[in-house]
Amino acid sequence: MPTLFDPLKLGAIDLPNRIIMAPLTRSRATPDGRVPTDLQVDYYRQRASAGLIISEATSVTAMGVGYAATPGIWSDEQTESWKKVTRAVHQAGGRMVLQLWHVGRISHPLFLNGALPEAPSAVKPKGNVSLVRPPTEFVTPRALERDEIARVIAEFRLGAENAQKAGFDGVHIHGANGYLLDQFLQDSTNQRDDDYGGPIENRARLMLEVADTCIAVWGESRVGMHLAPRMDSHDMGDSDRLGTFSYVARELGKRGLGWMAAREAQIGPETQLVDSQGRPREAQHKESIGPVLKELFGGPFIANEGFTFESAQKALAEGKADAVAFGKLFIANPDLVERFARHAPLNAWDTGTFYSGGEKGYVDYPALQTDLAAAAIMP
């Protein structure tokens, strides 16, 4: 019966434990060039004891951004700066993969030099653009032309190639949370009538072609996919949740991907879900289909959403996951692995600094040794 502290072979990557650092947008890259900074070097180095670090979502193209100060991987300058991050993580004994990202319609012309966001179909998402003040509604995106889709695939390939140059251990494709690949997948956002729309075989085509191009660069054992079968981010929805995600899991399994991750836990009384601002939220589709997807995929399965140490151990023991990813717990606890191992108290996260820029709430959370030393000298 595996535990969080047992090793795991994740495709070609050997993990010393099953405690994964989930991808976390923190808005600490440079605002203009979207280049990783020295702060990010320190941040990821501090968390290198994770079995695997999955980087924050990183845009493969300037047309794929939708938030301030998030990093990219399309330019030489970005790639060179990511080298500093991977070098620091590896020197600290860690492993790290890059999450490849295109936000699709979840953007705004203010991030795109006045251009409309691109999407499978011209379907406007409900709600406001994240972190923009005053509150600003999303706009209706433009539908990608059929002959533009090859360009999108090429952008993901460039991101995968640059991730290799930057020294990552693999790539993690962002197919979740209502971003571009998820928008193509689900029938509420994909209303196309060509070979990228209609039946699931067509709607999943782009996601699978992106997987194939990343495999061509890295080999299947160093590529993973991130899915969100709860469909509760950014105004998403599909008429056949189980059928849609089952098809994708089966197809990814046929390709022998190194791992699959799903932002979906079994919701129970102990589950504490919060949104990206740290506010409590209700879950849609409380019944998990993760175990079904895990079986259909057939490879290592990472679960993520509202897990505690206890619920994560239970998920592993029951065979519902092979590893568990933690997000906000890693924000506040750079030494989360050690704290779990010692059953030590956890730092509380500060929601006000999630996206605020600067050191505060980013690289200044105390490590356990610091806490213990302070306690020892207290009168």
Predicted ranges, named:
Residues 1-379:
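Flavin-dependent oxidoreductase catalytic cores
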